[in-house]
């Protein structure tokens, strides 16, 4: 019997391959993905080690919330780089032949879920840290009486579960994550969108990401203004100067890195979801914005942890020397960066009556 007319089974992966292609990925090798993944893992591993050491040294109540959220952030970034990077390296090593190594579309679904979760969860955690820090600075009594470590853990769990829920929405709706045009990553359907549900997923992802950035921006701005006001009221304390200067720079760094890295990708996804631009015409741009977003996971540990302790101290000394100003004693900068950054919330550990007395005296 002739086999020329026999029908060959169609792999699910072949139906999920994009009809368009990206030429930008042609010039990249597997070495780029390996280096990129390694840098991210090492950066976040160093941040985790610093946080663990700081947590062992400082176990006060007013510091536990920040340490818990910061640890969750860098751990999320760590596993995001580890899982997504490993899958990307495997895809490159397999010559991007999805039909061969992922006939059942299981790997693409896992890749897409991890991409969405590792994208939204750090943004949610960043906004949660901004809210907690804003309340601790502006309302220390309320922060002490209403926001406990137990509450922070509950909010952290809620944020993680919500990010998982958003990542699982396509699977729950019997939709599949789609292999993108470059054939190196999986995400929501971005090519030839005709169904409202596919648009909903893209718009929901973009809206939640931009909302998290907006909340972080507003809360960090309020915190920064409050710190500047405190600085101007305590000019006689050099320790206050150094501490508030450090906090303002930290907040500016957090806002700038998050907005610069994530805004282009989120806006691109929103534009595709609203049919403002065609994915065929923006494939290379989408890949570029995706890489910008992944850089946020590398820069997070340096902004949140390392930048405050090492760079600001050296920059402070060098700037004053270059300006010809006598360098004052910098014993304050020798303290832990975590201790300095959180000292503004130290009042939250005091009894309510003592807090009221301190606030009245100031």
Curated annotation (Swiss-Prot):
PROSITE patterns assigned: G_PROTEIN_RECEP_F1_1, G_PROTEIN_RECEP_F1_2
Entry superkingdom: Eukaryota
GO molecular function, a single term: prostaglandin F receptor activity
Bilayer topology term: Multi-pass membrane protein
Pfam assignment, any one: 7tm_1
Record-annotated disulphide pairs: 108-186
CC annotations in GO: cytoplasm; extracellular region; plasma membrane
Glycosylation, residue list: 4, 19
InterPro entries for the chain: GPCR_Rhodpsn (IPR000276), GPCR_Rhodpsn_7TM (IPR017452), PglndnF_rcpt (IPR000141), Prostanoid_rcpt (IPR008365), Prostglndn_DP_rcpt (IPR001244)
Main function: Receptor for prostaglandin F2-alpha (PGF2-alpha). The activity of this receptor is mediated by G proteins which activate a phosphatidylinositol-calcium second messenger system. Initiates luteolysis in the corpus luteum.
Listed name of the protein: Prostaglandin F2-alpha receptor
Organism lineage: Eukaryota, Metazoa, Chordata, Craniata, Vertebrata
Underlying gene: PTGFR
């Amino acid at each position: 019997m002739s086999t020329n007319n026999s029908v060959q089974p169609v792999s699910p992966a072949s139906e999920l391959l994009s009809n368009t292609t990206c030429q930008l990925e042609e010039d990249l090798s597997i070495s780029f993905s390996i280096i990129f993944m390694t840098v991210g893992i090492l950066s976040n591993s160093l941040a985790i080690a610093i946080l663990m050491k700081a947590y062992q040294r400082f176990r006060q109540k007013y510091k536990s919330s920040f340490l818990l959220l910061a640890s969750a952030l860098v751990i999320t970034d760590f596993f995001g780089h580890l899982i997504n990077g490993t899958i990307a390296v495997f895809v490159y090593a397999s010559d991007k032949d999805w039909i061969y190594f992922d006939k059942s579309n299981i790997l693409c679904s896992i890749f897409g879920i991890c991409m969405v979760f590792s994208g939204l969860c750090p943004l949610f955690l960043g906004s949660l840290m901004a809210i907690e820090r804003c309340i601790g600075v502006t309302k220390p009594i309320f922060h002490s009486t209403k926001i406990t470590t137990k509450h922070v853990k509950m909010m952290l769990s809620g944020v993680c579960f919500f990010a998982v829920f958003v990542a699982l929405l396509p699977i729950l709706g019997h939709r599949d994550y789609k292999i993108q045009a470059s054939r190196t990553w999986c995400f929501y359907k971005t090519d030839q969108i005709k169904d409202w549900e596919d648009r909903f997923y893209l718009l929901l992802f973009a809206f939640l990401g931009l909302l998290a950035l907006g909340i972080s921006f507003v809360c960090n701005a309020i915190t920064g203004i409050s710190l500047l006001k405190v600085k101007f009221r305590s000019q006689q304390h050099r320790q206050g100067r150094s501490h508030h200067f450090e906090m303002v720079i930290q907040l500016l760094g957090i806002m700038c890195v998050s907005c610069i890295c994530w805004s282009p990708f989120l806006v691109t996804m929103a534009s595709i979801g609203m049919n403002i631009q065609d994915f065929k015409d923006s494939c290379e741009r989408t890949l570029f914005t995706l890489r910008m977003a992944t850089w946020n996971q590398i820069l997070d540990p340096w902004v949140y942890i390392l930048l405050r302790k090492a760079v600001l101290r050296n920059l402070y000394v060098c700037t004053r020397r270059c300006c010809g100003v006598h360098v004052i004693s910098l014993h304050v900068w020798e303290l832990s960066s975590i201790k300095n950054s959180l000292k503004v919330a130290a009042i939250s550990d005091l009894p309510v009556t003592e807090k009221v007395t301190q606030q009245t005296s100031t």
